[in-house]
Structures are given as C-alpha cells and as structure tokens.
Amino acid sequence: MNEQTIVAGTSRREMLKRSGMGVVAGAAVGALATPSVQAAAADIKISYASWIHGHSMQIEYPDRIASMRRAGFSIDVEGKPGTTNWFHFAIPTPVIIDDVRLRADKVLLRFTTGSVDAFVRHVHVYDGEKLIAEHNNVNLSKENPLAGFVVPDRPLILLGLGISIGVAFGVEMMDHHMDFIAAGCDFTLRNPL
C-alpha cells in the first residue's frame, strides 16, 4: 500500500494535487465562470509579481508626521494636519529572467486611511531615476484592498522599480492615519499593445 504523508508546510495547492481535488476544483471553477471571464483570465500573462511589505516604507518628510508605528502587519502613519508628503516603496525587481528582460505591467497598493481627510493624491512609478508612470489626482481614501495602476506602454525595466505615493492630510477634525500593508508590481514579457 502506497501511503502519502502530508508534512508541515505543505501548501493547499500541494494537498489538492495529492488528493486529486485540484482537477475537480479546476473543472468546477471553469464550469462556473462565464466565457468572458475565462477569456479575460486566459489573456492575463503575468510572468513575475514582486511585493514588499508596508513596514519597509520610507517617508520623505518625517517632520510632517505626527506619529509613526511599524508593526508586523503594516506601517501606521499619522500625518500632521494641513501637510503633504511622499511615501516610497523599493520593489524587489527582477530585470531579467531566463535571458529575457521583463516589462512593468501594473503596480498595486494595499492600504487604508482613517478618513476622507487623509488620502493618496498621486502614484508615480520609477525605473531607477526615470519616471515611467504618473497617476495624479487619484484621491483615494478609506479601504483600498488592492488599488491597481497601469504602467503605460509596458516599458522594459532596466534598473530597479520604485513606487512613490503622494499623500495629503487635511485640516478637518478627522482621523489622519494611514496604514500601508503592501506594495507590488506585476511584470510581464508581453509587448505593449
């Protein structure tokens, strides 16, 4: 009798494969998804995704911050009322995989703010010192479980990818906290459309 042992650290995917349920689950999802969803899923060709945790975020103007706390789950920043600031994430960047240079497809942010008076104004994306994407006046606040920003023309990445987030803290008697949980980038081999 051939006995399979499931060890600590085995992922759910591995457990499903071992039990044969992966095929059943895949078939069920395929049967339930509409043709347009299936077509969109087939079009997604992300070669690599890289994320960095929120507690690694760098603050450009620390003197404009009332308080800051790094924790295992996020960085919590309280801005001084009536100020703006820039927060920066250095994304671990694989520029070449298997002799092929990657392209930036989209950057993603996971964050929350305490109120509409603490908000993300701008999202800029850099390859080294070169600005490759600029999303201004996005004005996002409250819950943002996965805010995505396309990098136009999917440029080849030559150096390292950085995400700079322009934020603002208003003057209303409202909560001026922001929690950044993570930031990342989807990389692709696809040429621009």
Spans of features found by a protein language model:
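N-terminal secretory signal peptides
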Residues: 1-14, 25-28, 37-38
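C-terminal segment of N-terminal export signals and the immediately downstream linker at the start
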Residues: 30-57
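Short beta-strands within extracellular/lumenal beta-sheet-rich domains
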Residues: 78-100
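A short beta-strand element within beta-rich, extracytoplasmic domains
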Residues: 100-114
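Short, surface-exposed beta-strand/strand-loop-strand elements in extracellular ectodomains
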Residues: 118-129
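Extracellular carbohydrate recognition and processing domains
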Residues: 132-154
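Noncatalytic modules at the cell exterior or secretory-pathway interfaces
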Residues: 153-174
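Exposed low-complexity, polar/acidic, P/S/T/G-rich flexible segments that act as propeptides
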Residues: 168-193
